[in-house]
Amino acid sequence: MNLQTATSQEVEDYLKTCTGIILPTGSLEQHGPVGLIGTDAICVETIALRAAEQASTLVAPVLNYAPAQFNLGFAGTISLSAQTFSQIFTEITTSLMRSGFDRVYVLNGHGANLAPLRSAVHDLYLKHDEAAPRVKIRNWWDFPEVNVLRQQLYGEWEGLHGTPSEVAITQYAVRSVTRENADPPRALSKDEIRETAGDYHGPASEHRKNFSDGRVGSFSELAEHEHGGQFVTAAASALIEEFRAFVKE
């Protein structure tokens, strides 16, 4: 069930049997020459709604405005400060708590969301202690089944941004953008992979200079529509299993 298309009475009825909700979090930022600006949001929303269809879970609207300052050198990117993002998440979660939800499962699609999300959760626990809803944060690509598939299909060319796996999901869910005879991006060193984990990048001008076409070690053009369906199926199945266990804790 989708929260924004549900009635208040339907939510009350849902809460009689389940007090958990899935909150997808994404971003609005460039994703390379063939990646859609809303890629992160599209991925988590598609996976979450598939899970909801199969398991009758409730899904909140995707939080798609997020910290992405490092991509502001590319047209169309919209960025919030980490502080603003954290505050919005806190107020969403507090509102859900007042409705009676005590489990909020965050399905995340954007690495730079992780630090402010975790900070906000600590503050919720500090303020409300045991009354605070329990929060679980999971990147969709970290499900073991999904990660195995990513490596099988793309290996090292999965990279870090504009990944073929996320592009494949948008091809499956929305549309494909083609680019003939595309060259692979510059491969990342182990140091770069370690230092930029969680989208920990420098300022926008520096980032555009280092990654001129927006791809960060990812050969986006390896994505295929069929792959997207495989990723959605695998991720939704893993999400259902983990969500069910979470709400029983």
What are these regions (language model features)?
Residues 1-103, 109-249:
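Extended, histidine- and acidic-residue-enriched regions that form the cofactor-binding/catalytic faces
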